Amino acid sequence: TAMQDPASGPDVYMTLGGAKTKDMVDAGQAMDLTDKISDTVKKQMSSALESVSYDGKVYGVPVTVQPGGIWYSKDLFKQAGIDAAPTTFSELKTDVQKLRSAGIDPIALGGKDAWPVGHWYYWLSMRECSPKAYAKGVNDKDFSDSCWTKAGDDLKDLLDANAFNEGFLTTTA
């Protein structure tokens, strides 16, 4: 019955975090959970708590962490003369060239649906930007930190290296 009264709102709700959580905080519709979270969780999950924290207070519980990764074929790497998976962006770019030289599409990407391409920029920006820069983007719509441009430059480097399969923008995920 609480859900039937728009004045009271729900006790528990799900949101995407970031600006959506901030809107709920600003509207007085979110409870400060800071003192209900153990110091261990605060320490070990500080990055995850960033998206639901404002002015040093925690207003949400992250229920998912979405790590990204790259699956690769050891056989294709071997065919291209690559002995190990890259561990740096520089190594990735070098391996892209080796794979391309061996006639292998380095990265298979289905970009027609947009979100897979967006993930590449997201992952690269996570690499370049600090939590503070992310918070300024979410809270203030301030993307003046050079990390955002660096992430775009990194993505352009991959495009210039012909890292993705031919026609990736018209290939479905």
Please describe what each predicted stretch is.
Residues L16-G68, K78, S90-T94, W120:
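Hinge/lid segment of periplasmic solute-binding proteins
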Residues D55, Y59-V63, G68, S90-D140:
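Extracytoplasmic/periplasmic solute-binding protein
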Residues W71:
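Short aromatic/basic micro-patch
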Residues P6-D11, K57-V58, R100-P106, A161-F164:
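Loop/turn elements at helix/coil->beta-strand transitions in domains of secreted/extracellular proteins
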Residues D32-Q44, I107, G111, E128-K150:
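Short, solvent-exposed loop/beta-turn-alpha elements that line the ligand-binding surface or hinge
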Residues V96, V138-T172:
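Glycine-centered hinge/linker elements that transmit conformational signals in sensory
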Residues D75-A85, A163:
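Aromatic-glycine-rich donor-binding/catalytic loop that engages nucleotide-sugar donors
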Residues T1-T21, S90, A173:
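Early extracytoplasmic/lumenal segment of secretory-pathway proteins
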